[in-house]
From Swiss-Prot:
Its EC number is 2.7.4.3. GO terms for cellular component: cytoplasm. It is found in: Cytoplasm. Keywords: ATP-binding, Cytoplasm, Kinase, Nucleotide biosynthesis, Nucleotide-binding, Transferase. Catalyzes the reversible transfer of the terminal phosphate group between ATP and AMP. Plays an important role in cellular energy homeostasis and in adenine nucleotide metabolism. It is an enzyme of class 2 (transferase). This is Adenylate kinase. One of its GO terms (molecular function) is adenylate kinase activity. Residues 126-142 are annotated as: LID. It comes from the Bacteria.
């Protein structure tokens, strides 16, 4: 099972990926985690990524694509994986398609969690309030203004992936505002049709 979860920040992608990982025993591949691992392992590509990050620059698609390709080849991905935070752009999606094709693989689904942005802001605010009430630490970017900026960035850069994957026939859209259990059940119906 090879899939991509799409949706803006706060849509519940991480929650759903965690449930899928537990149920199906496939890893959740996060771009950030993959970059950190490549740097820590001091692989050739990891050294290139570290040099770019140390210079305060964004890691190029070429480097990210290579790191993803190497990660997909790992034994724990033999039965599938969930991509989280990749691809972020249409060129990355096209590179992923070529990469998988070259390995004799293809995506099983691209699932977009459709959500109402105003409701997401309210959801984020209540999550912050709960964290504070429990005495927990709140991320510096967990405030309405920063969150709205992240939503705008998503809309501008990542949302075009919906059109791209709709065009390939791989996109499945579900209501991400439903309760966690309902969203999970809908994802299962898509992945394991009756």
């Amino acid at each position: 099972m090879r899939l991509i979860l799409l949706g803006p920040p706060g849509a519940g992608k991480g929650t759903q990926a965690g449930l899928l990982t537990k149920k199906h025993g496939i890893p959740q591949l996060s771009t950030g985690d993959m970059l950190r691992a490549a740097v820590a392992q001091q692989s050739e590509i990891g050294k290139r990524a570290k040099a770019v990050m140390d210079a305060g620059q964004l890691v190029s698609d070429e480097i990210v694509n290579q790191i993803v390709s190497e990660r997909i080849d790992a034994p724990d991905c033999a039965n599938g994986f969930i991509l989280d935070g990749y691809p972020r752009t249409v060129p990355q999606a096209q590179a992923l398609s070529q990469m998988l094709s070259g390995k004799g693989l293809k995506l099983d689904a691209v699932i977009e969690l459709k959500v109402d942005e105003n409701a997401l802001v309210k959801r984020m605010e209540s999550r912050v309030a709960e964290t504070i009430a429990k005495g927990g630490q709140v991320r510096s970017d967990d405030n309405p203004e920063a969150f709205r900026k992240r939503l705008v960035e998503y809309r501008e850069k990542t949302a075009p992936l919906s059109s791209y994957y709709a065009g390939t026939g791989e996109l499945r859209v579900i209501n991400g505002m439903a309760p966690v259990e309902e969203v999970a059940a809908e994802i299962e119906r898509i992945l394991v049709p009756a």
